[in-house]
UniProtKB/Swiss-Prot annotation:
Broad EC category: transferase
InterPro entries registered for this protein in UniProt: AcCoA_carboxyl_beta (IPR034733), Acetyl_CoA_COase_Trfase_b_su (IPR000438), ClpP/crotonase-like_dom_sf (IPR029045), COA_CT_N (IPR011762)
GO cellular component terms, semicolon-separated: acetyl-CoA carboxylase complex
HAMAP family the UniProt entry points to: AcetylCoA_CT_beta
Record note on cofactor: Binds 1 zinc ion per subunit.
Name of protein: Acetyl-coenzyme A carboxylase carboxyl transferase subunit beta
Source organism per UniProt: Streptococcus equi subsp. equi (strain 4047)
Pfam families: Carboxyl_trans
Length: 288
């Protein structure tokens, strides 16, 4: 018989659940909205350092902002009068879960649809204004978006106003099928009438502007300006590369690439847009 028993290789520890719960309660929690990660430089940024314009202090990347934030940055305080808020989609295809998706987007954004339309003053210059919000079903263009923008141009013709549109969209709204594609032609016809009346139309391309919006009113302005590094295109990069069987340049479909090739007139910093809009509208016979 051995004098000494063999020792275990490991020390058994019984977990103390009460200690674990006590420690977890004392760990501070950081609110999700306190910091933002820049998609460009990958730096973590304290939200307050972004400022109201939501521009990365490290690399100057322009974060996507809501229509309401854009409105605050652009127009004279208290001058905006919203129009055409009573237009509703007829949901022509009875697309599954479409109404639920619309309701969710309305609750998340505070908007009734993907575009905010109305009249406003920008440094004293009166104009008709539309701002698309990519947070609302990616600002896809359905019948309501098309109708609101068409009516805005009709109002601008009757009141002799310039039109300014901030574009941001993933394209036509698939839940409305061919009816969404019809909006491209309808809005373009209204733009033509506005142009024939000798009135000024300015488009401002923001990230992202793609699909049917790019193929219609986004690229039909008398002047086309864009925010830095905005994604602007029709089809997606992978679709194009697969179709043409070639690798595209790294900066393909960026605003700077489009300016270099003559599709955009100017790249303007977000913080300078208000001054630039007022200057261009006044230069083209604006209304004050």
């Amino acid at each position: 018989m051995a004098l000494f028993s063999k020792k275990d290789k490991y020390i058994r520890i019984t977990p103390n659940n009460s200690l674990k719960s006590s420690v977890s309660r004392n760990v501070p929690e950081v609110p999700d909205e306190l910091f933002a990660k820049c998609p460009a430089c990958k730096h973590m940024i304290y939200q307050k350092d972004l400022g109201p314009a939501k521009i990365c202090p490290t690399c100057s990347y322009n974060f996507r902002i809501s229509a309401q934030e854009r409105l605050t940055l652009t127009v004279d305080e208290g001058s905006f009068q919203e129009l055409f808020t009573d237009i509703e989609t007829k949901d022509p295809l009875r697309f599954p879960d479409y109404q639920a998706k619309l309701q969710k987007a309305r609750q998340a954004t505070g908007l009734h649809e993907a575009v905010l339309t109305g009249t406003a003053l920008v440094k004293g210059q009166r104009l008709a204004l539309a701002i698309m919000d990519s947070h609302f079903i990616m600002a896809s263009m359905g019948t309501v978006v098309g109708e609101k923008i068409t009516r805005l141009f009709e109002l601008a013709i009757s009141e002799r106003l310039p039109v300014v549109i901030f574009t941001a969209s993933g394209g036509a709204r698939m839940q409305e099928g061919i009816m969404s594609l019809m909006q491209m032609a309808k809005v373009s016809a209204a733009i033509k009438k506005h142009s024939n009346a000798g009135l000024f139309y300015l488009t401002i391309l923001t990230d992202p502007t793609t699909g049917g919006v790019t193929a219609s009113f986004a690229m039909e302005g008398d002047m086309i300006i864009a925010e830095p590094q905005s994604l602007v295109g029709f089809a997606g990069r992978r679709v194009i590369e697969t179709t043409v069987r070639e690798n595209l340049p790294d900066d393909f479909q960026k605003a700077e690439f489009l300016k270099e090739h003559g599709f955009v007139d100017a790249i303007v910093k977000r913080t300078d847009l208000r001054d630039r809009i007022a200057h261009l509208v006044a230069f083209h016979g604006g209304v004050s």
